[in-house]
Structure formats: structure tokens, C-alpha cells
Curated annotation (Swiss-Prot):
This is UPF0259 membrane protein YciC. One of its GO terms (cellular component) is plasma membrane. The keyword Membrane applies. Its main location: membrane. Pfam families: UPF0259. Belongs to the UPF0259 family. It comes from the Bacteria. The chain crosses the membrane at residues 20-40, 87-107, 119-139, 142-162, 189-209, 219-239. It is a multi-pass membrane protein.
Length: 247
């Protein structure tokens, strides 16, 4: 059976429209969780204020020079802030992936599903999803840091790993290996979707300053919700495509 990207896009659009409110609530809940966890583990405002002083004194300096000129306490604040942002993002992404994939599974099986039920049903697989997303993010970031293209390629070839982990109950490394093989064989169907997702996330990042007009917490939740909606669309597409490839 020949699979066309157009037919999968159409199926994705239909599912997204039919389940929009549930998907929106899942995205909003995950954004709220991300922001709350980030706020809990982030340094206090007084500690963050010390970093503002460094920026003021070093407007013309490079990032490496700025970090070198920081005091030990300022470096600790920077590490804590970075760790809080990374950890909260990973938790939010794991819950989003688990909730969305379980939502798709249950709806496809004919069940009526709420956002809370979808997220709750994903609880048993969240530890494995967290590890998978951590490893995938690490590999993509390392690739982007060095030459960019390898990072983008890693994002593409590992795109099916969460779907395989949930749908076929694979282990973390088995799903990564299988995703690389299957994606490579279906690059024309997967690469455009992943690249579109990356472009959408990049555009949102560039527009992040627009959300500064709101309070920091509301702006962060709104930006994360939009980002989660982009990811939800990609997950729907990948799930539907994977089911067609397996037939």
C-alpha cells in the first residue's frame, strides 16, 4: 500500500480538529506543570538579580568571557537556573508525549477520553519516556552545538522513538534503534514534518519577547502551550504514519 504525506496530513488535521479541546487542555496542563516545576527549582529573584549585574557590566563581552568573569556564587545561580529550566522542560515534554500518545491510542480504540484521563493513563510509561526524551534532547543539542546539521538529522531519525516505545512497549534503546532504521527508510515522509516542527518552534522562540508584555508566569504558560500544540500535531502525524507503515 502506497502511503502519501498528503493523506497522513489530512488524517492528522481531522484528528486535531475533532479532539481540539482535549489536546488544548493536555497542552495547557503540561505547560502549567513545566512552569510550576521551573519556578519551584529556579533561584530566587534576589539570586537572579546578581546575574543581571554581570550582563550590565559585560554588554560587549562574549558568553564565554561573561561566565569566566562570574563569581562562584553567580556561576552556581546560573547552573541552578539552567538545570531548573532543562528539568522542567523534560518533565513537561515527557508528560505531553505520554498524554498525547495515550489519547490517540484510546480515541482510536473508540473510547471517550478527557485530558486528565489521557495523562493519568500515561503514568506507567513516563519514566521510560523521560529517559528517552532526555537522551534524544542531549544528542540533538550536541549535534546542533557542533555543526547544526547532525543535530537536525538526529531529531529526524529519532522522531518515531516515542511512538514505538508507547505503541509497541519497547525499551528506550530498542525504540531508538528501531526509529533510526524505520525513519531512514521513510525519510521523505518524516523529514518534512519534523523540519516544519523545528521551524515552528524556532519562530515561537523568536517571538518569545512578545509574551513579555504579559506577566512572566502567564507569558511562559502561553508560550509553552503554543509550543506543546506544535508538538502535539507532530505526535499525531507520527503516530498515524507509524500505524500505516506497520500495515
Amino acid at each position: 500500500m502506497s502511503i502519501t504525506a498528503q493523506s497522513v496530513y489530512r488524517d492528522t488535521g481531522n484528528f486535531f480538529r475533532n479532539q481540539f479541546m482535549t489536546i488544548l487542555l493536555v497542552s495547557l496542563l503540561c505547560a502549567f506543570i513545566t512552569v510550576v516545576i521551573g519556578h519551584v527549582f529556579s533561584p530566587s529573584e534576589a539570586q537572579l538579580a546578581s546575574l543581571d549585574k554581570v550582563e550590565t557590566l559585560s554588554d560587549n563581552a562574549g558568553l564565554f568571557e561573561i561566565v569566566q568573569n562570574m563569581s562562584l556564587e553567580q556561576k552556581q545561580v546560573l547552573v541552578q537556573a539552567s538545570a531548573a529550566s532543562t528539568f522542567s522542560g523534560l518533565i513537561g515534554n515527557a508528560i505531553l508525549a505520554g498524554g498525547m500518545l495515550l489519547l490517540i491510542q484510546l480515541v482510536s480504540a473508540g473510547h471517550r477520553v478527557s485530558a486528565l484521563r489521557a495523562i493519568g493513563a500515561s503514568a506507567p510509561i513516563l519514566p521510560k519516556l523521560f529517559i528517552l526524551i532526555f537522551l534524544t534532547t542531549l544528542m540533538v543539542q550536541i549535534g546542533i552545538m557542533f555543526v547544526v546539521v547532525p543535530g537536525i538529522l538526529m531529531a529526524i531519525v529519532l522522531a518515531l522513538a516515542p511512538v514505538m516505545l508507547v505503541q509497541d512497549k519497547m525499551g528506550v534503546f530498542a525504540s531508538m534503534r528501531s526509529s533510526i532504521r524505520l525513519t531512514w527508510a521513510n525519510m521523505r515522509l518524516i523529514a518534512p514534518a519534523v523540519l516544519s516542527w523545528l521551524l515552528a518552534k524556532t519562530a515561537l522562540l523568536l517571538l518569545a519577547s512578545r509574551f513579555a508584555a504579559l506577566t512572566p508566569e502567564v507569558g511562559a504558560i502561553l508560550a509553552n502551550t503554543l509550543s506543546n500544540l506544535f508538538s502535539a500535531v507532530l505526535l499525531i502525524y507520527l503516530f498515524r504514519l507509524y500505524m500505516l507503515i506497520r500495515q
